[in-house]
Amino acid sequence: VIYTVECSFADPDSEAEWNDFYSLEKLPALISVTGFHTSQRFRSIGDGCPVYLAIHTIDGIDVLTGEEYRRKGGGNFARWQQHITDWHRNLYSDIGPAPAVKADERLVLCASGPDPLIQMGLAPLALQAVALERFPERRWLAILPQENARLVENVRDDLHLYAPMTQQLTSTRPLSTAQKK
């Protein structure tokens, strides 16, 4: 299952410190939680969506309601909570492990259908919301070489482009059978 967390951050004075915390402390803590298999963080390029996006591969919603998640990952950023805006969480199914996006690539998300991505010569993966907010209900994601990113910027309101802020972290624990698609 793909777990997404999106948000913006409203305090420019502490945003760099927030980013260090999230990328250097929170993501490694999350990947240590049983049931988390991959984690990667992104920053949007452009407007019309939350600034930050984290994409995780997890075993299912039970991981997010467990004690280990509460202890190591969930809710451990009370210091920053007042500055977090436009916060959204979703669980999506149907693609297996989240693809790793390299430093010289961009992640493209589209909620209006796969056609814009296919027309760009990309191979979109379909995401179907299964829990939490369930909005957008369907999304398509694809990986774009960085040199082609200018083709996407400001072309369509329904395409959102993201640059990776971190490498994809991976757990040493095996994926559940359902995740190995």
What is each residue range found by the language model?
Residues V1-K181:
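Macromolecular interaction modules
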